[in-house]
Amino acid sequence: MAKVQILNMVVLDNPCPFHNPFQFEITFECIEDLPDDLEWKIIYVGSAESEEYDQVLDSVLVGPVPAGRHMFVFQADAPNSSLIPESDAVGVTVVLITCTYRGQEFIRVGYYVNNEYSDPELRENPPLKPHFGQLQRNILASNPRVTRFHINWECASEAKMEDIENVDPASNAMLPPNCAPSKGLAAALNPIPENSMDCM
């Protein structure tokens, strides 16, 4: 069972100009004390065609985390527009908020993001070269996609002892569960986890 549950995530300052920071108010609960840090990341998917355009907008370590309910506002600068392919600047993309513990991602929250010109004339006749200063970002806050992954919450020595106690003497090796989600718009929101995905 996961030792951390996200209870709520609120998208702040939405909609807003493209260059405004991303802001998420995150409420989560720990069912017991965590001795190590949680690492939270905000990732902007720059193109559905290739994950090479993904930008980690910010990463923050939170911890050690005592048992109980916690809330913080996670803010990250807008993506570097020069790293976004011109053909992907306007339209729908994805922003991801991920959390890892001891290097293992255990939850991913994805939101669709629509970037469009606020000026109706620019919407009708978009320029060949995107004008990021004229774009408005609108996050579909009402429909986040939440994907959870099984991880090992114990430290290596505890996990090793547990494996030794639970190993089948006839087997040669324990194969830990592994889940390496792929990227892209649909893939970023719908990786193939080994347990569950739902809407918040």
Curated annotation (Swiss-Prot):
Cysteines paired by S-S bonds: none
Main localisation: nucleus
Gene3D superfamilies for this protein: Histone chaperone ASF1-like (2.60.40.1490)
Compartment(s) where it occurs, according to its Swiss-Prot or TrEMBL record: Nucleus
GO BP: chromatin organization
Presence of the UniProt keyword Transcription in the record: yes
Annotated family: Belongs to the ASF1 family.
Free-text function comment from the UniProt entry: Histone chaperone that facilitates histone deposition and histone exchange and removal during nucleosome assembly and disassembly.
Protein name, per record: Histone chaperone asf1b
Organism: Xenopus tropicalis (Western clawed frog)
